[in-house]
Amino acid sequence: MFFSPRRRHLFVVLTVMLGGALAFGTVGTAVAAPPPVPVLPALPGVTTPPLPTNIGPSVSDPGSLYRHPADLASMAPGDVIRAVKRPNPFRTIPSEAWQIAFRTNNSHGKPMVGVTMVLVPFNHRADIPVLSYQMIINAMGMRCQPSQSVYTTTDWIASPVDPWGFNFALARGWGIAIPDHLGEKTAYAAVRMSGQVVLDGIRATTRFSPLRLRKSKFALSGYSGGGMATGAASTLQATYAPEVNIVGSVWGGVPTNLTQMAEVIGTDNSHPAFGLAMAASLGLEREYPKELPISSHLNWLGLQTRAQMANACTNEILAVGFGKSAQMVAKNFDMLNAPETRKVLALNSIASMPEIAKAPVFEFHSPTDPLISVKSLDATMKRYCRAGTKVYQLSTPAPEHLSAAAVGFFPAYEWMADRFAGKPVPSNCRG
């Protein structure tokens, strides 16, 4: 078996030591796909140069995957724009790797380009199970998104950990789709947009004929920031992409209520994870510049912090924001209770989304997690249960957000394997 008891132990130790799961091959030759999908030459090299941190917008992908085609608006969500064959990501089982650009929508229903990476075992049979794995991207920079980060060590909190999830899937003969779920603006916390990117990435995976995955079953998985994208995708699936065959989703450590997340991290008191709350605010500003002009309410320290975070990954965001508070970086709090602010937060909080996840859900968290509202998470799961969704919740014995990822990993993946196998779905819905 791929994960021996010793390897499981090493994984848990490594994950906790590295901040616990906030959750080399040569360059391949491009393979032509049937028209009308253009296949680009393989991108030279697998590293990304350092990017400046003193500018506002996210730095774009240095390749051409995110380039908008002239006919983007006429394409359907999930239609493939272009694809490129890529080398195997670091520390993963050798596999066939593709990056696929596709049409998707932003939060306002406008067309944009999404990107997903798909790994499949060599010489795989058609229509194998596929896991859509939403990486732990609590970030502001395009270099932190999977299309780049799987080839670098830019985000040392997530990058050593995520390959374990990739390898678990590949070792079982599954494919794995890894979307850039923060979109082309790297709009962290724009959860509704992220869910749409995930679903359209699955559509693109089934429509790209060289992969032979047209009739595949899909499961979703993600922790922390990746869990928000996973939760949004599973919640929106029935209305946004009802034809997508999702057999289940795994949510880990998911902040389901952005307002409560901000309150937990605090406005008056300094907090070691304040950087995540500020990054979420700035990410929402990128997606909703008119409704949330956050930058105009920042003082000099806030603007300096914003510049330092502009293209930062998780570890950098945590370092820049360590010990700060909203009181320290804001000129005023006029926006906090503004109707526009509350509306945007509600639109991007899974707890207040009117849609209901229909596919089974496995949800796990630490009962004493200081970064999420467990009360909101439990209420969301109860609402799904009342609507008939089969939910299994696991309250791990982990004391906080980081170590809970390691503790919940294996039971979550075994649950997922059972969904692909068509076994009866357990549920511990209550109340």
What are these regions (language model features)?
Residues 333, 337-344, 348-351, 368-371, ...:
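C-terminal catalytic histidine-bearing segment of alpha/beta-hydrolase fold enzymes
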Residues 1-33:
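Secretory targeting and sorting signals
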Residues 32-125:
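Catalytic-loop region of hydrolases
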Residues 117-118, 127-139, 143-151, 249:
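Short beta-strand element of the alpha/beta-hydrolase
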Residues 44-64, 68-71, 255-354:
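Accessory cap/linker subdomain of secreted extracellular hydrolases
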Residues 161-165, 188-210:
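Alpha/beta-hydrolase active-site loop
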Residues 357, 362-369:
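Short beta-strand/loop motif that positions the catalytic acidic residue
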Residues 203-274:
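Primarily recognizes the serine-hydrolase "nucleophile elbow" in alpha/beta-hydrolase
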